């Protein structure tokens, strides 16, 4: 609408100053943090880098038939995928990691086949990991208690496992030394998460069912891990179709710069309700004077919300895009719209060519291609041109198939007006791309 008397940026600033939620416009789904189907996010910071562990989603019928990924970032804006080495292929749900006092990393997860929790150990946050023990339980999430200094693991079986906390023990953080039953009466389904603040333990979990719109994030508080935990009267996050948030659940908590964010997954709006196609998103929450939590706003860009500047600017954002073919609901322009849940897709057995016009010749530092499935093989090439006639090859994987995540980014300085992606073949026999980013230097950095 054009009836506003104030510029949009002024109005947004006034809303924020008034403490009102800055929500996506109705009908406009919340933008995921990551490009693609990733669920069960567990975020940790080791050193100066953030690690976002996720379940690889988007495979029929149960979602997780792919490799396990962790996405890393130093600024919460630019995320890079890495394969978590040493885990089973196709059957890992909800990986979560904690660093021990011995400087080793302990990964807790569960199998999508036997529905039982496991613990792995490795020397780095990305592995390679080695399986050490079967822990039982489900949706295991480690918790470093700042009060006792001990590490616990919370389970969807409504238990808190006190682990062996002796670093000299051969079963350090891999054996349960004591089980604490979670006391309280609440709609506890799965995905528990613990954190501590100002004398209160906060237990968050997913209520409802992941394949229904009833899926939501709830929480309870207690003064000790022994409980009892007192349930909050209403969900912290729930289905909000007016703002494109379908079935949010399975969260972790990020505390940074004095602010608190929930990272969770929401269902793909195209397929909702669904338990197999989910996107990782973020929302900011705040604490009331009595310690209760409230939703502040849905977040489309976590780094930008925190004022963290990327070294790059996307030169391709909302620029003219041309393709030789496209599906009716997945058009070429969606590969340059800045969203991580819209894509350009061709029909079956159709190779695809996508060209972005930057409108003038510009200096480029990096090109990123986010294919629909990062762990699938495909053949493709990337080229650039100043006149749309003479082309220079930037990356050529046309003769030997490569896994998408292994060829996601190319760092090279060049000048061009046009960038072209040609997808010759893929495991799905089509071309499907969330976003083609052409990155230049951010002048505001």
Give residue ranges: language-model regions.
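Bacterial N-terminal signal peptides that target proteins for export
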Residues: 1-12
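Bacterial N-terminal signal peptides
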Residues: 11-22
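Disordered, acidic Ser/Thr/Pro-rich linker "stalks" and the adjacent N-terminal cap
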Residues: 304-360, 370-376, 396-404, 437-445
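Trp- and acidic/polar-enriched beta-sheet ligand-binding modules for extracellular glycan
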Residues: 348-350, 374-444
């Amino acid at each position: 609408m054009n009836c506003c008397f104030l510029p949009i940026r002024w109005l947004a600033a006034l809303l924020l100053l008034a403490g009102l939620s800055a929500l996506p416009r109705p009908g406009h789904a919340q933008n995921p943090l990551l490009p693609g189907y990733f669920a069960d996010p567990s975020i940790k910071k080791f050193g100066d880098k953030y690690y976002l562990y996720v379940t690889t989603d988007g495979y029929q019928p149960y979602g997780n038939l792919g490799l396990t990924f962790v996405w890393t970032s130093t600024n919460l804006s630019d995320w890079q995928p890495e394969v978590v080495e040493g885990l089973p292929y196709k059957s890992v749900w909800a990986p979560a990691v904690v660093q021990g006092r011995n400087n080793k990393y302990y990964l807790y997860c569960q199998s999508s086949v036997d529905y039982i929790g496991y613990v792995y150990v490795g020397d780095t946050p990305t592995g390679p990991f080695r399986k050490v023990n079967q822990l039982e339980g489900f949706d295991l999430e480690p918790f470093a208690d700042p009060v006792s200094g001990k590490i616990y693991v919370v389970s969807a079986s409504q238990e808190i496992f006190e682990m062996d906390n002796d670093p000299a023990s051969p079963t350090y953080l891999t054996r349960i030394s004591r089980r604490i039953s979670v006391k309280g009466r609440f709609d506890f389904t799965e995905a528990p998460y613990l954190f501590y603040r100002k004398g209160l333990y906060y237990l968050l979990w997913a209520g409802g069912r992941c394949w229904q719109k009833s899926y939501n994030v709830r929480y309870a508080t207690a003064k000790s891990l022994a409980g009892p935990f007192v349930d909050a009267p209403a969900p912290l996050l729930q289905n909000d179709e007016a703002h494109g948030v379908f079935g949010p659940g399975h969260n972790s908590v990020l505390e940074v710069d004095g602010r608190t964010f929930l990272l969770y997954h929401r269902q793909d709006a195209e397929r909702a309700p669904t338990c197999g196609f989910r996107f990782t998103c973020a929302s900011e929450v705040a604490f009331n004077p009595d310690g209760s939590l409230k939703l502040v706003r849905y977040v489309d860009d976590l780094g930008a919300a925190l004022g963290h500047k990327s070294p790059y600017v996307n030169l391709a954002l909302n620029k003219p895009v041309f393709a030789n073919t496209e599906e009716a609901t997945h058009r070429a322009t969606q590969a340059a719209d800045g969203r991580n849940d819209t894509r350009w897709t061709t029909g079956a057995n159709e190779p695809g060519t996508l060209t972005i016009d930057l409108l003038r010749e510009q200096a480029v530092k990096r090109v990123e291609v986010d294919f629909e499935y990062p762990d699938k093989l495909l053949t493709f090439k990337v080229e650039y041109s100043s006149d749309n006639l003479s082309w220079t090859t930037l990356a050529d994987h046309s003769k030997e198939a490569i896994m998408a995540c292994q060829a996601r980014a190319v760092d090279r300085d060049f000048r061009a007006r046009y960038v072209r992606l040609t997808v010759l073949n893929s495991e799905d026999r089509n071309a499907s791309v969330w976003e083609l980013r052409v990155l230049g230097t951010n002048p505001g950095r």
